[in-house]
A protein has these predicted regions:
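Ser/Thr- and Asn-enriched, surface-exposed coil loops between beta-strands
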Residues: 392-396, 480-486, 583
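Extracellular carbohydrate recognition and processing domains
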Residues: 467-501, 639-646
């Protein structure tokens, strides 16, 4: 059964998860004991730390990336542990990002990943038999599974089964039971807000004699006797179920107790529940994130405090292998999850959901309170919020207040299309990014003026900002017309090798000092679409989170040297960038092979384990490979090439036709339809040193 408000409930649940993560993350390090949190912050009623932008977190990475097994492998059947294991290998960069790389035999996820790389398939990769009970029963079994509950609404058994399949990649025993419990609880929350019923639905999907069930029952029994004192219950957990009894870095059982504690003492209040989960210590971001998903779904958007929601502003970042996927718009993702939910339930999907195109940006502001991460450059003059007063289409739009502006005063209203290290306070989980907007694409939006004061109408000018130079490329100014919708559309100009990190409008007053401009504009149907055509000039790039912008590197040592990207590696390595969903395009790379036999260009790469690679391949040879969890040579021919000589290598994918040209000469053409979309990049199949001077990408 799919509830009528399914998309909105998913939206609330996913917001809730990320609110919990953001609230709990600052006090997650073990130095933050329960007592220290209480003595420092007392009763927590809001975020304890402000961020420019909240960096990536493993608790968000896993639910997002591992669910992609439903797109890649389990397209028309139920999920298996091996499907999810393939997502682990495909979307992770080894040793960085995604999850905690704490060492084999220390970090459960690191251990499972190495097992998978060594050919130990799931579920053996996460089993007690393989890794021992302590490693297998750490908390990760339940912290990467929220989305499996979100795509299986009102079906706790199926949600639990999917969650178990996903968790078995890395966990076993009680660790898997945590996945079953939370997926079932999330699923149940779609049909009831009664927290007791939700908890019981979770417990119904695990053995009653399990430790997980026992700690949950101990908390519920304590609550019956002491319903108003969560701190007394926390003391009971410390005494009877603490880390001294359940060892490892972060065992699931004590934290399961905190999760049930926060839900039962929170009594259906979203804010209070995530606050209690944070105040209780131990794995604060994991616990607050899990219960945040449950309570977000149960309470809906109206139950989430604006002081928690506003700083997120509908945007989060990830740290998988795709810099494009790492920039996530929550309302858009809620719709994507809903489409999966309808598919899994074998129920026809509402046509309006299917209108979304993965390779484009489309913000319709239809979900209540949605802002799609639109920002203003000057909050003194302008403020954004969701509105239902005006809408070009549907019922919602973005309202931008402009407050007493005079001639020459302005504020930018923009979508943040790309990030660098300077946009963050820290380097949590080392995210990397590829822009969401490129030269050649079209930007369009509808704008309505509701001006209350001033002696001249407001003016706007579309613009994009260049990420390295911070230079605005401003298009022509035009006057708005009061109480009318106007179309604003422009083609993003050639950025001459730079990346774009802002797309929007400059809102400027033309009023004299008295009376000042006061009023609102409404923005609706914000879109970025069409074929991109751009270059990457490495003179205009930077190192960000250890990567050359806009790439995500996997293995090898990468750097910027004299205006070029340079790799030195003793093993196979690759680097990816671009629109993850790009279909037909060419990528031309000017490279200089300096040592080694393999110097390739990637196209339609869907991760570390999927895609095409073509280029210089051994002495006097060029080849085309398909990577499908292992490289298979599709075609090759003789081509005399030399080290320390520059080559222009162009690879084109057009339908099923793949073409390799070097210095303008077509050398290979082959038909293959394994991969229809994906990123571009560069790679090597072995030890090599290569210098890359320029890339040109042209979508067909």
């Amino acid at each position: 059964m799919i509830p009528n408000n399914y998309v909105e409930k998913i939206y609330a649940g996913y917001l809730g998860m990320n609110i919990g993560i953001r609230l709990g993350a600052p006090v997650e390090p073990t130095i933050w004991t329960y007592e220290r949190i209480q003595n420092t912050y007392g009763e927590i009623t809001g975020y304890v730390k402000d961020f420019k932008n909240f960096a990536a977190d493993d608790d968000a990475n896993g639910p997002y990336y591992f669910l992609r097994a439903l797109y890649d492998d389990a397209v028309d059947r139920d999920i298996t542990p091996n499907d999810v294991a393939r997502a682990w290998l495909n979307y992770s960069r080894e040793g960085i990002g995604m999850f905690w790389w704490g060492g084999y035999g220390v970090s459960t996820e690191h251990t499972a990943y190495i097992n998978l790389k060594k050919g130990i398939s799931a579920p053996q990769s996460g089993s007690i038999e393989q890794n021992g009970q302590i490693i297998a029963e750490q908390i990760g079994g339940q912290i990467f599974i929220d989305t499996w509950g979100l795509v299986n609404p009102c079906n706790p058994k199926k949600a639990a089964d999917f969650g178990e399949a996903a968790a078995r990649v890395s966990h076993d025993g009680e660790g898997v039971l945590g996945a079953r419990f939370f997926c079932a609880a999330i699923s149940k929350a779609f049909e009831t807000a009664n927290i007791e019923d939700i908890i019981e639905a979770g417990l119904a999907e695990i053995p009653s004699d399990s430790l997980y069930a026992q700690v949950a029952r101990a908390v519920l029994a304590f609550h019956e006797q002491h319903p108003d004192d969560f701190r007394a219950c926390r003391a009971m957990l410390e005494r009877d179920w603490g880390y001294d009894k359940y060892t490892g870095v972060c065992h699931i059982i004590p934290n399961a107790g905190v999760c049930v504690l926060s839900m039962i003492y929170g009594q259906g209040d979203f804010n209070l529940t995530v606050e209690i989960a944070t105040m209780c210590g131990w794995d604060t971001d994991c616990n607050a994130g899990n219960v945040g998903t449950v309570l977000g779904v149960a309470c809906g958007l109206s139950g989430i405090g604006e002081h928690y929601r506003a700083p997120i502003n509908d945007g989060i970042v990830m740290s998988g292998i795709s810099g494009y996927l790492n920039i996530l718009d929550i309302p858009t993702y809620a719709k994507e999850l809903a489409i999966l939910g309808y598919r899994l339930a074998n129920v026809p999907c509402p046509p309006e959901l299917l209108d979304n195109k993965e390779n484009e940006i489309h913000f319709d502001f239809e979900l209540p309170g949605s802002t799609h991460n639109i920002r203003v450059s000057d909050p003194f003059f302008c403020r954004v919020k969701h509105s239902t007063e005006q809408a070009y289409q549907g019922s919602g739009s973005l309202e931008v207040l402009f407050d007493r502006m005079t001639r020459g005063e302005s504020s930018k209203v923009f979508y943040k299309s790309f990030y660098t290290r300077d946009d963050f306070n820290d380097e949590r989980y080392s995210p990397t990014f590829s822009p969401k907007a490129y030269s050649g694409q079209t930007v369009s939006m509808k704008i309505y003026l509701d001006q209350w004061g001033g002696n001249a109408p407001m003016t706007i000018a579309p613009y994009v900002r260049l990420a390295k130079s911070k230079r605005d490329l401003v298009q022509g100014y035009r006057k708005l017309v009061n109480e009318q919708w106007i179309d604003v559309e422009f083609v993003i100009p050639d950025t001459e090798g730079e990346l774009i990190d802002e797309v929007g409008i400059v809102l400027e007053s033309d009023s004299t000092r008295k009376p000042k401009s006061l009023g609102r504009i409404f923005i609706d149907e914000f879109q970025i679409y069409g074929s991109a055509a751009y270059t990457i000039d490495f003179h205009k790039q930077a190192m960000s989170f250890g990567c050359v912008t806009p790439f995500a590197h996997n293995q090898g040592a990468w750097s910027l040297v004299d205006g070029s990207m340079y790799v030195m590696t003793a093993e196979p390595s690759e680097s990816y960038a671009g629109n993850y969903f790009a279909t037909d395009y060419s990528v031309e790379v000017t490279l200089n092979p300096q040592s080694g036999d393999s110097h390739l260009v990637a196209i339609r790469a869907q991760g570390a384990m999927r895609g095409y690679h073509a280029g210089l391949d051994g002495k006097d040879q060029v080849s085309l490979y398909a990577n499908d969890f292992g490289y298979k040579k599709l075609a090759s021919c003789t081509y005399p090439w030399k080290l320390n000589q520059e080559y222009d290598i162009k690879v084109t994918a057009d339908g099923s036709t793949l073409t390799l040209s070097i210095n303008g000469e077509q050398l290979l053409q082959h038909e293959d339809d394994a991969w229809s979309y994906g990123m571009y990049g560069v790679s090597t199949l072995g030890a090599a040193r290569t210098n890359y001077r320029k890339l040109t990408i042209t979508e067909l």
